[in-house]
């Protein structure tokens, strides 16, 4: 299953818009089953799909903490045929503190996606937060491919450079990194 992450340290680079529209296109035009994993505390991927994420439970946070059912059980259908959502909201902000002492804290998303039964989805598109953080590290470790939306501004390019540097560190530490 392809795992495509939309990542940039800079906010406002259209990560969420590109992620949601790409997922909808793959589902509708290609007839594939797609899951959007929203890893941004703003929950904008869900909001863009018409899902009220305020107070929604369970979310990606419970999946990452292992206190909830599986990814497949938490994923919710959307109005777009073939497109499901693993929602996020502000509760995700506590995740780094919740797992601070856990040795597998950077591999939670990868491990949970590895548990997804074969054939559940053809692709998982991951909407990353606008930061370099433990959540972003989880995203990069789980992804097989990375899309770096970049506006033609200094700060957007700087954010892109930070993500590329993070990928270099990941490659040095693990011997692998997602394709950009």
PLM feature spans:
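P-loop NTP-binding core
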Residues: 1-180
């Amino acid at each position: 299953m392809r795992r495509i992450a939309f990542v940039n340290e800079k906010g406002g680079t259209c990560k969420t818009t590109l992620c949601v529209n790409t997922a909808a296109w793959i589902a509708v035009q290609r007839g594939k089953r797609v899951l959007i994993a929203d890893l941004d505390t703003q929950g904008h991927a869900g909001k863009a799909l018409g899902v009220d994420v305020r107070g929604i439970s369970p979310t990606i946070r419970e999946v990452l903490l292992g206190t909830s059912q599986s990814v497949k059980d938490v994923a919710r259908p959307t109005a777009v045929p073939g497109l499901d959502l693993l929602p996020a909201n502000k509760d995700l902000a506590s995740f780094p503190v919740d797992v601070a002492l856990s040795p597998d804290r950077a591999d939670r998303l990868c491990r949970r996606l590895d548990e997804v039964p074969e054939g559940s989805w053809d692709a998982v598109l991951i909407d990353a937060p606008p930061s370099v953080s433990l959540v972003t590290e989880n995203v990069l470790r789980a992804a097989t491919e990375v899309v770096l939306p970049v506006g033609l501004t200094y700060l957007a390019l700087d954010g892109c450079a930070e993500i590329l540097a993070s990928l270099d560190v990941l490659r040095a530490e693990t011997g692998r990194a997602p394709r950009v």
